[in-house]
Swiss-Prot record:
Keyword Protein biosynthesis among UniProt keywords: yes
GO-annotated biological processes: ribosome disassembly
Pfam family, one: EFG_C
Species: Prochlorococcus marinus (strain MIT 9301)
Function recorded in the entry: Catalyzes the GTP-dependent ribosomal translocation step during translation elongation. During this step, the ribosome changes from the pre-translocational (PRE) to the post-translocational (POST) state as the newly formed A-site-bound peptidyl-tRNA and P-site-bound deacylated tRNA move to the P and E sites, respectively. Catalyzes the coordinated movement of the two tRNA molecules, the mRNA and conformational changes in the ribosome.
PROSITE patterns associated with the record: G_TR_1 (PS00301), G_TR_2 (PS51722)
The protein's name in its UniProt record: Elongation factor G
One cellular-component annotation, GO: cytoplasm
Source organism, top-level taxon: Bacteria
Compartment(s) where it occurs, according to its Swiss-Prot or TrEMBL record: Cytoplasm
Domain tr-type G: 8-282
Gene3D superfamilies in the cross-refs: 3.30.230.10, 3.30.70.240, Elongation Factor G (Translational Gtpase), domain 3, P-loop containing nucleotide triphosphate hydrolases, Translation factors
Xref: InterPro entries: EFG_II, EFG_III, EFG_III/V, EFG_IV, EFG_V, EFG_V-like, EFTu-like_2, G_TR_CS
Length: 691
């Protein structure tokens, strides 16, 4: 089957931003103008196409990254609409991993918010080229150039306006296109009747000034264009487009557009810019991976290359399990067998679909550069690589943040225990930041996630989709343990009970690992002191012991263990004996390595009228918060602080009463830090008292 669109005319883009910047409305308008939907759906009416879960339609926020295909100007555009709420960071993270370009949406009033910074960092992590759409230009207080300056200052981006609004707030009547040097005036409410016109005389001077800045910035990055610009003082529309595109692909500049998705102004120009400036799959670096030999390799974006794809999302729905994939190379056909190289398992492709939110179109194949979904995969989860059985490769996977909050959960009726277990398994398959475990002491089922809203929505889904009513305990902080110094550890397990005995013996060196490494194991056994077949079990014994630290039973992270020596017995040694010896050595070593307790620290931003600034700062300090920045603008104060999550429960209520209901705050995970000694002692004694 031939391609519908050549690879050069494919765009895989994400629409990302902070909450309430208008991402989903922007996506809806894109679908309307490109002909996918014939009626505009509003988020606040609960009718948005991309918000297809019941909870999304009720809450007016996007929870899961919905993938949709559309076309514009003879280009295929695959769009992922991502959530702006920090509890759903993994959805943004996994979509960034598979995208080629991003439209970052900012509110013309709110500007750069803490969540905008998080999304920007995620795009930086995966080197995703981007453009900006400053939305809500119809709102009171809208200021396009102020937001442009914030993007430059706070996100350190070379933000370059390629448009100017004509009017603002209630008088937004059109948009000046600085590249084409003309104006577009909107003549009807639906935004379908657009008049191309000269730039209004009262804005000619301002437009000329900004066009000159645009030409200078674009020329700076291109030797050929700088010569033309220095000679003639002018660049043509085509030269500007070429220069902007090259600047975007090299991460040298970020074009900034404006409009109001809700008022149907500026969205078609955003689509034009996607086609003109954002990369096709062939414009970005080929995906890297590792061959079975351990050698690094790349897969070019080409239908004729060996097949490779990354599973970036798993979802259960009434028709079965849907696995979303980004095709990097080759062709994937319905009915074929492929290899999951991450898990070394064979999978059969029963059906392939392209999604239009909750509608699906069945296809016979997916090709390099496509975003689609597979039905029928049994073993594949988020972050796994699918490839040809003859040409195996494991692609770079996703960064998955640690959960920061946990609650105990139990079914309201004993008979629902099995249903609860099935529901939790299905939900954790879909969402790698949602973890399920059993407390060994209380035997309670514990669920952990990225925040209270995250867990609340998952519990809600258990009721709606799996018909399980559950009782939820009070939220608990997910503490961690780590070590601060190095030491040796030894574990010898010897049992003789008549007949065949048990013998395993290992000596290890322990030291702190780099932050984020988790458990790192290095084998330095020489001369066969520990046979090869027992090294894996010894490592597994240590890794399992990591799950429960020595201070208060919390998981131990960022520990490097080097296996240096040991001994074995020809008859009595076994995998189990070495697993136990590994665990004993680990426990012995960790006690001597100055273990400490860690707690999740949250990046908090509080916005309130400046009369309450003193109270807000005082309250944050009383919560062990470190104030990192503050500003006052137009009578509104903003405070940035780092506060332990343990101190933030109930903060929303306290802030409301402290600011007479006029304060708002946002919170996101920053990092794990050591708990002060007096606080740690209380946590440790409480946990030891419970055990």
């Amino acid at each position: 089957m031939a391609r519908d669109f050549p690879l050069e005319r494919v765009r895989n883009i994400g629409i990302a931003a902070h909450i309430d910047a208008g991402k989903t409305t922007t996506t809806e308008r894109i679908l309307f103008y490109s002909g996918v939907v014939h009626k505009i759906g509003e988020v606040h009416d609960g009718a948005a196409v991309t918000d297809w879960m019941d909870q999304e339609r009720e809450r007016g926020i996007t929870i899961t990254a919905a993938a949709i295909s559309t076309s514009w100007q003879d280009h295929r555009i695959n769009i992922i609409d991502t959530p702006g709420h920090v509890d759903f960071t993994i959805e943004v993270e996994r979509s960034m991993r598979v995208l080629d370009g991003v439209i970052a949406v900012f509110c013309a009033v709110g500007g750069v918010q803490p969540q905008s910074e998080t999304v920007w960092r995620q795009a930086d992590r995966y080197s995703v080229p981007r453009m900006v759409f400053v939305n809500k230009m119809d709102r009171t207080g809208a200021d396009f150039l102020k937001v442009n300056k914030q993007i430059k200052d706070r996100l350190k981006a070379n933000a370059l306006p390629i448009q100017l609004p004509i009017g603002a707030e209630g008088d937004l009547t059109g948009i000046i296109d600085l590249v084409a040097n003309k104006a577009y005036l909107y003549k009807n409410d639906l935004g379908t009747d657009i008049e191309e016109a000269p730039i209004p005389s009262e804005m000619e001077e301002e437009a000329a000034e900004w066009r000159n800045k645009l030409m200078e910035s674009v020329a700076e990055n291109d030797e050929e264009l700088i010569e033309i610009f220095l000679e003639t003082g002018e660049l043509s529309t085509e030269q500007l487009k070429k220069g902007i595109r090259e600047g975007v692909l090299k991460h040298g500049l970020v074009p900034v557009l404006c409009g109001s998705a809700f008022k149907n102004k500026g969205v078609q120009l955003v689509l034009d810019a996607v086609v003109d400036y954002l990369p096709a799959p062939v414009d970005v670096k080929p995906i890297q991976g590792v061959l079975p030999s351990g050698k690094e390799d790349v897969r070019p974006s080409d239908d004729n290359a060996p097949f490779s794809a990354l599973a970036f999302k798993v979802m259960s729905d009434p028709y079965g399990k849907l696995t979303f994939v980004r095709m990097y190379s080759g062709v994937l056909s319905k009915g074929s067998y492929v290899m999951n190289s991450t898990k070394d398992a064979k999978e059969r492709i029963s059906r392939l679909v392209i999604l239009k939110a909750d509608e699906r179109e069945e296809v016979d194949e997916l090709r390099a550069g496509d975003l689609g979904a597979v039905l029928g995969l049994k073993n594949t989860t988020t972050g796994d690589t699918l490839c040809n059985t003859d040409d195996p490769i494991v692609l770079e996977t996703l960064f998955i943040p640690e959960p920061v909050i946990s609650v105990a959960v139990e079914p309201k009726t004993k008979g629902d225990m099995e249903k609860l277990s099935k529901a939790l398994t299905a939900l954790s398959e879909e969402d790698p930041t949602f973890r399920v475990s059993t407390d060994p002491e209380t035997n309670q089922t514990v669920i952990a996630g990225m925040g209270e809203l995250h867990l609340e929505i998952l519990v809600d889904r258990m009721l709606r989709e799996f018909k399980v009513e559950a009782n939820i305990g009070a939220p608990q902080v997910s503490y961690r343990e780590t070590i601060r110094s190095s030491s040796k550890g030894e574990g010898k397990y010897a049992r003789q009970t008549g007949g065949k005995g048990q013998y395993g013996h290992v000596i290890i060196e322990m030291e702190p690992a780099e932050v984020g490494k988790g458990f790192e194991f290095v084998n330095k056994i020489v001369g066969g002191a520990v046979p090869k077949e027992y090294i894996g079990p010894a490592s597994n014994g240590m890794k399992e012991t990591c799950e429960s630290g020595v201070l208060a039973g919390y998981p131990l992270i960022d520990v490097k263990v080097t296996l240096v020596d040991g001994s074995f017995h020809d008859v009595d040694s076994s995998e189990m004996a070495f697993k136990i010896a590994g665990s004993m050595a680990f426990k012995d070593g960790v006690k001597k390595c100055n273990p400490v307790l860690l707690e999740p620290m949250m990046k908090v931003e509080v916005e309130s009228p400046d009369d309450f600034l003193g109270s807000v700062i005082g309250d944050l300090s009383s919560r062990r918060g470190q104030v990192e920045g503050q500003s006052v603008d137009d009578g509104l104060s903003k405070v940035q602080a780092k506060v332990p999550l343990a101190e933030m429960f109930g903060y929303a209520t306290q802030l409301r009463s402290m600011t007479q209901g006029r304060g708002i705050f946002s919170m996101e995970f920053a990092n794990y830090e050591e708990v002060p000694r007096n606080v740690a002692e209380a946590i440790i004694s409480k946990n030891q008292g419970n055990s």
